[in-house]
């Protein structure tokens, strides 16, 4: 029995040891490199990387242990950071008359400033050092090097103002006879001097501008006015209503009620240099007789781009390009190849919603240090209480790092230090979750399809599938984005779509019959669909009819002149032939002439297209390039899907 008990105990230890080390053996040991992987007690799926010394932390981005107290982790509110050795940093200031090496104001300087009527403070103008501050109601006399009161030099104030602010005792040269016990009881007007005209040596009230004392208040000079004086301002600005501060000169004024009548109801009216201007707000444009913020051009969303109205013009922009790390952005296509995640936690400080971006670099450094350099950008979505951050990674994050922020590796009381500089509350971090972009960044694109497409996350793709009542004609793919181009008709259900997808094909409903077909510019292979590399017989015949040679390049068939041959060039058309009309009508479209060629357009667009100028052509993207890129990406995904099916069957 004793032997059996020992055997059972041994097996239990082996099983327990295997369970505890599984996360480390499967992933953690390689992740931690020169640090030691340890399973978090009570959480067998979580691990931490322990460095050989307590004064070190593991930097997952650099794959190495680093010292905790360095200039990388220390913030200097004043002075500069200096590392006395690899494991010790401190904030220091250069030796000076006013500061110590530890950036403290010297006692001698503080005493001297106090004797001159001021308070010694650290400079906040970008320079390192101390300054003798005379306060809001004083100024430094650079001749005597003493603080002088400015309350009686302020023409923008009254004696009642000084009384209510309890400032009467600061300067006896004005407001004689006023009593702070009753600021509403003013003495006779001719018995005291008003602020701006203090009492002089002869007992008379003197304009401070004439005695040059106004220089303590006015930075750019002064001039005498009916209100004692007012400050002058530099070119491009004018004195404000208080007579002291300066404000920029505006050449634009508001419109009168009569002038507003010349504008449309939705336009803003302003007068610039005497001319009445009627304009839409900067984020709207004029469509018909109304200013609207919505885009009316569909080409943006057809290429997976967002459309926005800026400075009264609508334009396409790619929401992914501004988020990418380097110059490897294809300027001709809007691709989504990155992976988006979200995480929330409680920091030791809070910001208002206008300053969330201030925290992004700090959070990015902490995230990369914790889980690795795959994350290249952080966007703070909310920071008013808890921080909600969007993490953008070059590739999918390992499932083993998604709970990494929840393991408090470096506790400090009720807080956890996420090196190098992020302090968060214990147990406040959520698990890192992949973001479903259909519910966030792709909402605008989904809305732009006007109910024809619905955004669905399918495996690795965000797919704008045809909605009920629409059927797929073909598909476009840009990285992780896919869109089914739809037309009114019977749509396939999820089972039919899944059945076709398993074959690497798309569902097509034509002539009352449903079937699976290879996407355009792919062809059936031994398994699934493969990317085309040659012209098909129909394309070859069309080129031969033109005495040209069919060449398949850039994912499309083109008719080219053979080498050393002089070829016939098809003349420009000025009207659609019966064959052209029939071809377009078969797909529910209408034939129009663009740049001498017959093209098929949706009937709703045909009227506009028929009158389109050459300038409109320049604004459209090259359809060859976009479709070629789409087929290339689609072909690659389908080939991978087919390969996966084969592997699974084997």
From Swiss-Prot:
Proregion residues excised on maturation: 628-650
Localization of this protein: Cell membrane
Region listing for Disordered, in residue ranges: 603-628
Keyword Membrane in annotation: yes
InterPro entries: EGF-like_dom (IPR000742)
Residue positions with a glycan: 141, 182, 348, 382
Membrane topology, as annotated: Lipid-anchor; GPI-anchor
Top-rank taxon: Eukaryota
Protein name per UniProt: Glycoprotein antigen BM86
EGF-like domain location: 20-66, 67-104, 205-247, 251-292, 291-335, 482-530, 531-568
Origin species: Rhipicephalus microplus
Disulfide bonds: 24-37, 32-49, 51-65, 71-81, 76-91, 93-103, 209-222, 218-231, 233-246, 255-269, 263-278, 280-291, 295-307, 300-316, 318-334, 486-500, 492-516, 518-529, 535-550, 543-559, 561-567
Keyword Metal-binding part of the UniProt annotation: no
GO cellular component: plasma membrane; side of membrane
Keywords annotated in UniProt: Cell membrane, Disulfide bond, EGF-like domain, Glycoprotein, GPI-anchor, Lipoprotein, Membrane, Repeat, Signal
Lipidated positions per record (GPI-anchor amidated serine): 627
Residues of the signal peptide: 1-19
């Amino acid at each position: 029995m004793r032997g059996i008990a020992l055997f059972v105990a041994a097996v239990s230890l082996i099983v327990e040891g295997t369970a505890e080390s599984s996360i480390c053996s499967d992933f953690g040991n390689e992740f931690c490199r020169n640090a030691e992987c340890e399973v978090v007690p009570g959480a067998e799926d979580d691990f931490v990387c322990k460095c050989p010394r307590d004064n070190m932390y593991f930097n997952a981005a650099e794959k190495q242990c680093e010292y905790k107290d360095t200039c990388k982790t220390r913030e200097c509110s004043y002075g500069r950071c200096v590392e006395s050795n690899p494991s010790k940093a401190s904030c220091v200031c250069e030796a000076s008359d006013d500061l110590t090496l530890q950036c403290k104001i010297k006692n001698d300087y503080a005493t001297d400033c106090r004797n001159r009527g001021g308070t010694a403070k650290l400079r906040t103008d970008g320079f390192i050092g101390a300054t003798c501050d005379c306060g809001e109601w004083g100024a430094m006399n650079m001749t005597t090097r003493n603080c002088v009161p400015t309350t009686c030099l302020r023409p923008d104030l009254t004696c009642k103002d000084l009384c209510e602010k309890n400032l009467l005792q600061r300067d006896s040269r004005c407001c004689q006879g006023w009593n702070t016990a009753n600021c509403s009881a003013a003495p006779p007007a001719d018995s005291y001097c008003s602020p701006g005209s203090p009492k002089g040596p002869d007992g008379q009230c003197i304009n401070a501008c004439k005695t040059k004392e106004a220089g303590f208040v006015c930075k750019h000079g002064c001039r005498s006015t009916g209100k004692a004086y007012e400050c002058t301002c530099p070119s491009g600005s004018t004195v404000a209503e208080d007579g002291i501060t300066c404000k920029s000169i505006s050449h634009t004024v508001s419109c009168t009620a009569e002038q507003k009548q010349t504008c449309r109801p939705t336009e803003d009216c302003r007068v610039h240099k005497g001319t009445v201007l009627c304009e839409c707000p900067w984020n709207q444009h004029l469509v018909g007789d109304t200013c609207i913020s919505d885009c009316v051009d569909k080409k943006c969303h057809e290429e997976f781009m967002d459309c926005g109205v800026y400075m009264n013009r609508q334009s396409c922009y790619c929401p992914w390009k501004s988020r990418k790390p380097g110059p490897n952005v294809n300027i001709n296509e809007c691709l989504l190849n990155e992976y988006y995640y979200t995480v929330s936690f409680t920091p030791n400080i809070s910001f208002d919603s206008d300053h969330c971006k201030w925290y992004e670099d700090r959070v990015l450094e902490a995230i990369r240090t914790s889980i690795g350099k795959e994350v290249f950008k952080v966007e703070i979505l909310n920071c008013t209480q808890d921080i909600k951050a969007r993490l953008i990674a070059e590739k999918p994050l390992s499932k083993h790092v998604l709970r990494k922020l929840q393991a408090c590796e470096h506790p400090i009381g009720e807080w956890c230090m996420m090196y190098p500089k992020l302090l968060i509350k214990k147990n406040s971090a959520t698990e890192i979750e992949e973001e479903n972009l259909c519910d966030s960044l792709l909402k605008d694109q989904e809305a732009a399809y006007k109910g024809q497409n619905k955004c669905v996350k399918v495996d690795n793709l965000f797919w704008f599938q045809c909605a009920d009542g629409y059927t797929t004609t073909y598909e476009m793919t840009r990285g992780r984005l896919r869109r089914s181009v739809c037309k009114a008709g019977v749509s396939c259900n999820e089972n039919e779509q899944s059945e076709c997808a398993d074959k690497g094909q798309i569902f097509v409903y034509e002539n009352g019959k449903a079937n699976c077909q290879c996407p355009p510019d792919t062809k059936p292979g031994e398994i699934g669909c493969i990317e085309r590399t040659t012209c098909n017989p129909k394309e070859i015949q069309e080129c031969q009819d033109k005495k040209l040679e069919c060449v398949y390049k850039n994912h499309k068939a083109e008719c080219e002149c053979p080498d050393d041959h002089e070829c016939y060039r098809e003349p420009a058309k000025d009207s659609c032939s019966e064959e052209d009309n029939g071809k377009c009508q078969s797909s529910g479209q209408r034939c129009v002439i663009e740049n001498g060629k017959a093209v098929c357009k949706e009937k709703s667009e045909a009227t506009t297209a028929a009158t389109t100028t050459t300038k409109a052509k320049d604004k459209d993207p090259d359809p060859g390039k976009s479709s070629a890129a789409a087929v290339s990406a689609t072909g690659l995904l389908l080939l991978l899907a087919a390969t996966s099916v084969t592997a699974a069957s084997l």
